[in-house]
Amino acid sequence: MFEVVKQGLEQKLPKELVAELLETYSETKNNYYLSKFRPNEVEGGRFAEAVFRILEVQAYGTYTPLGKQLGTEKLITNLQNIPFGKQSDSIRLHIPRTLRVIYDVRTKRDAAHLTDGIDPNSQDATFVMAACDWVMAELVRLFHSVSPQEAQNIVENIVERKLLVVQNFGGFLKTLNPSWGPKERLIATLCQCGKNGATVDELIS
């Protein structure tokens, strides 16, 4: 799924932004599944910064260099002031406002500053992960260069909840419960594959 997303986005966006987007998204997912909630929030912030730059490219044809401070408040205001019809509402309103909340969780909660004595928790991390999933789905819809059916399959697999007992090791799916028999392993693997399914050879291997 990631390779399809990568190839599609790179046809419309700078490669370094696509790489940053996918790296931070993947890290956020992995940290969430491992219950590393503090890194999850921080990576959610990095993900938001990558998407803010993608919005800059779409709206203005240029973007704030990676490593340079983003003026997110000004950017959000500028995007919402783009005349109706010149950009989609997702670019103007929905994605920026979602990123603002992700960014606030990252910068104003315990994950970034440790100022209010509140430990990061699963509630914050679950919100960040769901918001990142939604934003990724929107980006696929906006920038995909595949068929409509392929794009829909990609979106559905992005937002689909994955099983913690199945991990992907270099393209090889492995179930982590040693007490399971072949039937349980087969069912779990098929659930993890989602709507794309799996071939008989893939299941045997």
Feature-to-residue mapping (PLM):
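Short helix-capping/hinge SLiMs at alpha-helix to coil transitions
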Residues: 37, 191-196
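Charged alpha-helical initiation segments
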Residues: 1-39, 154-170
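Long, charged low-complexity segments
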Residues: 2-10, 27-29, 66-141
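Long, low-complexity, charged/polar intrinsically disordered regions in eukaryotic proteins
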Residues: 110-184
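Residue-level detector of well-ordered alpha-helical segments, enriched
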Residues: 39-43, 98, 131, 182
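Short acidic, hydrophobic short linear motifs in intrinsically disordered regions
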Residues: 186, 195-205
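Hydrophobic residues on short alpha-helical segments
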Residues: 183-191
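Hydrophobic alpha-helical packing segments in soluble, helical-rich domains
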Residues: 40-62
